[in-house]
Amino acid sequence: MKSFGSVRSIFMHANSVDLVLMGLGLIGAVGDGFITPIIFFITGLLLNDIGDSSFGDKTFMHAIMKNAVALLYVAGASLVICFVEGYCWTRTGERQASRMREKYLRAVLRQDVGYFDLHVTSTSDVITSVSSDTLVIQDVLSEKLPNFLMSASAFVASYIVGFIMLWRLTIVGFPFFILLLIPGLMCGRALINISRKIREEYNEAGSIAEQAISLVRTVYAFGSERKMISKFSAALEGSVKLGLRQGIAKGIAIGSNGVTYAIWGFMTWYGSRMVMYHGAKGGTIFAVIICITYGGTSLGRGLSNLKYFSEAVVAGERIIEVIKRVPDIDSDNPRGQVLENIKGEVQFKHVKFMYSSRPETPIFDDLCLRIPSGKSVALVGGSGSGKSTVISLLQRFYDPIVGEILIDGVSIKKLQVKWLRSQMGLVSQEPALFATSIEENILFGKEDASFDEVVEAAKSSNAHDFISQFPLGYKTQVGERGVQMSGGQKQRISIARAIIKSPTLLLLDEATSALDSESERVVQEALDNATIGRTTIVIAHRLSTIRNVDVICVFKNGQIVETGSHEELMENVDGQYTSLVRLQIMENEESNDNVSVSMREGQFSNFNKDVKYSSRLSIQSRSSLFATSSIDTNLAGSIPKDKKPSFKRLMAMNKPEWKHALYGCLSAVLYGALHPIYAYASGSMVSVYFLTSHDEMKEKTRIYVLLFVGLAVLCFLISIIQQYSFAYMGEYLTKRIRENILSKLLTFEVSWFDEDENSSGSICSRLAKDANVVRSLVGERVSLLVQTISAVSVACTLGLAISWKLSIVMIAIQPVVVGCFYTQRIVLKSISKKAIKAQDESSKLAAEAVSNIRTITAFSSQERILKLLKMVQEGPQRENIRQSWLAGIVLATSRSLMTCTSALNYWYGARLIIDGKITSKAFFELFILFVSTGRVIADAGAMTMDLAKGSDAVGSVFAVLDRYTNIEPEKPDGFVPQNIKGQIKFVNVDFAYPTRPDVIIFKNFSIDIDEGKSTAIVGPSGSGKSTIIGLIERFYDPLKGIVKIDGRDIRSYHLRSLRQHIGLVSQEPILFAGTIRENIMYGGASDKIDESEIIEAAKAANAHDFIVTLSDGYDTYCGDRGVQLSGGQKQRIAIARAVLKNPSVLLLDEATSALDNQSERMVQDALGRLMVGRTSVVIAHRLSTIQNCDTITVLDKGKVVECGTHSSLLAKGPTGVYFSLVSLQRTRY
C-alpha cells in the first residue's frame, strides 16, 4: 500500500483535462505495445512462405505481397496510435509539472516559521524541489511512463500472439518471464534506495554552493573561495560513492537481460522438437519464440526506466509531503474569529517560550506584558534578551509553550491567522525586498492599492525623492534581496510597505537603524505620525528614537525588569534604562557645548535638496524592467571565439579516468557485438527448421543452443563491467564539472552576480540540473552509443559478407529510421528559451520566498508570489503545446516508417529469392540481422532526446567555464604582497555600477587614507560611502582613474592575496550555515586554527559570553544565514571573524549598527584596540562611534565636501555639513 501511495504521488497534480490526456495517452501507449507483436505474427507467416519450397513463383509472390500489404496497414495504424501517445504524454507532463511547482511553492509558503527553523536547513532544499524534482517527474510523465506502458502492453500482446500461433510452445516458454522480472525487481529496489540517498547527499553540497553564490561578497572579502570549494568537494564524495553502487546495481539489472539468450537457446531446442514431432512450421516457431523473448525483454526495457521512476517517486514523496502538511499555525485556515472593531490592546499573560530549534534555551519563562490600545510601547534591552521574540509571537510566527497572548481580550489562537496578520504592519531590522520593481515591493503591503497610494506611502517614508530620480522610477528593479539598493533605501521601501497597509498595530524592529541622520529624522517623523491612533511596538537600540513613546519596557534575560515613560525611568539613577542611556550620550563634551540645534534649520533646507540627487547614486538597478536573457545568453558574449562547447572537450575532462573509459568502451563494444551475433545465429536457426533431415537438425540445433547459453553468460559479465566503468566516468566527471563550475563562478566579478538573471537560485538550479544531465550523458548515453556503433558495425560486416545486394538495400533504409530520431533531437533542442527561463525564474522565486519567509508570512503575500510564478510560466506553457504536436508527429512517423521498411525488405528479399540471387537461409540471416539491428538503432534513437538535453547542458557548462573574468582574482603575474602598510589613495576616479552605466557615482573623485590611521566616511544615504569599500575590496574597477594601495595600482596585485590583508565587517551581518566556530574560522588564513585563537577573537568582539551560555557553545548551529541567532549576536560573530583575520586594512561598514548599547560600547572598545596600528575605513551613521577617528571625511553627491578631525569639523560651526549631522544626532536628556 505504501508503494502504491508513493507512485500515486506522481499523479496527484492531474486535473480532469490531464486525466483525459493520460487516458488517451494510455490507449496510444498500449496500442503502440501491440503493434510489434502483430508485426511478429505477420513475419511468421512471411517466413513460412519463404521457407516453404512448395510454392510456385506466382503463388509465392502473391503470398508475400498479401502479408507485405498487411504490414503497411499496421504502419498506418501505428501512425495514428503513436501520435496520440507522443502528443498526450508530452502535453500532460508539462501541465502537471507546472501545477506541481505552483502547489509546492504554495505549500511551502503556507508553512509556519517554526517549520523552516527545523526542516529547511537551506534555501537549496526548496530550489532543488522546485527545479530538479519537478523536472524529474515531468520527464517520467512525458517520456519514461509511456515507454514503460508500451513495454508492459508489448509483454501482454506478445503472449496473446504466441498462444494464437502455437499455444504448446507458448505455455512452455511462459514461466521464463519470471527470470527476467526477479533480477530487475531486486535491483530496482536497490536503485530506489540508492537514488534516495544520492538526493540527500547532494542536498548538503547544493546548500554550500547556494551560500557561496548568494553570499559572494563575503566569500570574496575573506578569501574563502578555496574553503567553500573544498567543503563543496568533500560534500560531493558521498554522492559519488553512491553513484558507483548505483552503476553496479544497474549493471546487474541490465546484464540479467542476458538470460534472454539462454531462454532463446532452450526455446530453440524445444521448437526443433515441435517441428520434428508435431509438424510445426519454422516461421511459426521463430515468431512464437521472438514473441516470448520480446515480451520478456520488453519488461526488461521497462525495468531500465526503474531508475527514473525511483527518482520520480522520491521527488513526488518529498513534494507531496510538504503539500499535504498542515502547519500548526495555518494561514490558509479560514476558521477563526474576525473582530469587527479592533482597538489593538495587546496582552501577554504568563508566557513561556523557547524556540523548537533550541529547546534547551528558554527565551521567556513567565512573561507578562500589557500594551494599551493606541499607545506606543518601546522594548529595549541587550541583544538576545527576547525583544524580537515578542513581535514573532504576536504575529503568530510561533505559539507560546505556556500562557496566552490576547488582542482586545481575545486569544490570538482563536483569531483567523490571515486576518490577524493583516492588522499588523512590520518593518524588520534587516529589510527584506524581492527581486521585482520598487512598486511591486511596496504593493506587498497592500495588494489592491492604487499607484497614488504607493506614491503617498513612499513620500511618507522619505523614499519618493530618490525613487523619482531613477530613469524607470517606481518600475526600477531592486535586484535579488534588494542588492541594487543601499541599506537606507531598502529600509525606506520596507517602511513604505508597512505604511501603505494602514495597520492597527505597527511593529517596528529597528526600523531606522540603517538610515543616515537626515533620513532618520524625516522617517522618524513619518513613523511618529503613523503611530498616532495605532498600537505601536518599537524595538530600538538607539534610545533617542523612542524617548517619546508612551511606555518603555526594559528586557533582561527574557524578563521585564523596568517599565515606565522615559522621564519616569530616568528618575531611577541606578536603573537599567538609565545605564543604557548613559552609554549613548556623546562623550565629547565639546560637541555638547558648541552645537546649537537652532542653527541647523537653514543648513538642512539645502542639504535635503542634495539628498534627492545623491540618494540615487549608489543604485545598481537594471537597465530594463523586462530583462529576459538566460544565464547562457549572459555568458555567451564573454566566451573566447577559439573555445566552443563540444563533446570532445567534455571527454577531455574525463582524462583522469582513462582506464575506466578504456574498460567501459571495450566492454560496450563487446556487449554491442553480442546482439548481431545472436541475431545471425537466430536467422541461421530458422533455416535449420526447414531442413528435411532430423539428424542434421538435431546436430545444428545443439551447436546453436550452446552458442546462445555462452552469449547469456558473456552478457551478464560484460554488462557489470560496462555499467560500473561508465558510472565511474560519469560520477567523477560530474564531480569535477561541479567543482570547476563553482571554482569558475567564484572568480567572476561581483557585477556579474548583480545581474537579475544570475540570481543564486537560478545558478544553483543549473548547477544541479546541468551536471546531472551531463552525468546521464556520459554514464549512460555514451555507453549506449558505443555499443550501438559496435552492433551496427558488426551487423553490416556480416550482412555484406552474406549478400551484398540485399544488405545494401537494408543498410540504405536504416538512415531513414535514424533520421526520424535525429529529428526528435532537433525538435527538443528547439524548445524556446522561455522554457529554460521558467525553471530559472521558478527557482529564483522559491529561493527568495524561503529567504524572506518571515516577510511573506507577516504580509500574507503568498498569493502575490504565486501570481509571479504563474506569470513566468505562461510563455513556456504556450510553447509546450507546439512541442507536444511535434513530439507526436515525430514519434508516429518514426514508428510507421520502421514498419514500412520491414515490408520493403520482405518484398525485395522475395524478388531476390525468385531470381536465384540469394537463398532462403541467407534471407533469414539477413532479415533477422538487420531487423534486429534496426531495433537496436531505434532503441538508441530514443536517447536522442537525452542527447539534445545533454547538448544544451554541455553548452551551459562550457559557457561558464569559458567565460572571461573581468576582475581576475588569480592573476598569474599579479604582485603577491607579504605585508601591507595600508596607504590607500583614490586618484581621479570615475565610477558607475556596470548594471547602470548612465548613473555616475564618482566623477574625478580623489581621497587619501593614511596608513595606520583611522578614517571615517560619513554622509547621506547613497552618497557613495559603501562604494569606496567596494572599490578597495576590488569588487568593482573604476571606469577611469586609479585606486592605489601602498602606492601600487590595485589592479596590479594578485587579488586574493591582497584581500588576505583586508578585513570587512558589513552593515548586514552575513553568516554561513554552519557552527559558530566554523563561521569565526572563515577569518583565518588556514583551516587549522587553535581553539584559543577562536575564543580570543570572540572575546574581543564581546561574543564569547553569549556563546558559552548556549548548550552547544561554539558548536551551536547558526542556521541558514545565521537565522538561529539574533541580529546583535550575528554581528558580533561577524566582528570576531574579522578580528581573527588580523588584517592590515580594516573596513567597517556600520559594524555596530545591530548591537544594543552595552554590547556596542564593549565592541567599540574592541574595535578601537583592533584599529590601533592599522589602516581603518569606518562607515557610520551613528557619529558617536567615529568621533575618535584620526580623519573624518564627509561625502555629498560623490564628492568630498569636508575633511578633518571631529574637533576641527565642529569648529566650522553651523555652516559645516558635519556640524549639522552631529546636531541631528545630539542626544538631549
Curated annotation (Swiss-Prot):
The chain crosses the membrane at residues 22-42, 69-89, 145-167, 171-193, 251-271, 274-294, 661-681, 703-723, 782-800, 807-823, 885-908, 923-943. One of its GO terms (molecular function) is ABC-type transporter activity. GO terms for cellular component: membrane. ATP 2 binds at residues 1019-1026. Disulfide bonds: none annotated. It comes from the Eukaryota. Glycans are attached at residues 529, 594, 758, 1004, 1157. CDD domains: ABC_6TM_Pgp_ABCB1_D1_like, ABC_6TM_Pgp_ABCB1_D2_like, ABC_MTABC3_MDL1_MDL2. It is found in: Membrane. Pfam families: ABC_membrane, ABC_tran. Residues 22-311, 661-949 form the ABC transmembrane type-1 domain. Residues 346-582, 984-1222 form the ABC transporter domain. Keywords: ATP-binding, Glycoprotein, Membrane, Nucleotide-binding, Repeat, Transmembrane, Transmembrane helix, Transport. It is a multi-pass membrane protein. PANTHER family: ABC TRANSPORTER DOMAIN-CONTAINING PROTEIN. Belongs to the ABC transporter superfamily. ABCB family. Multidrug resistance exporter (TC 3.A.1.201) subfamily. This is ABC transporter B family member 22. It comes from Arabidopsis thaliana (Mouse-ear cress).
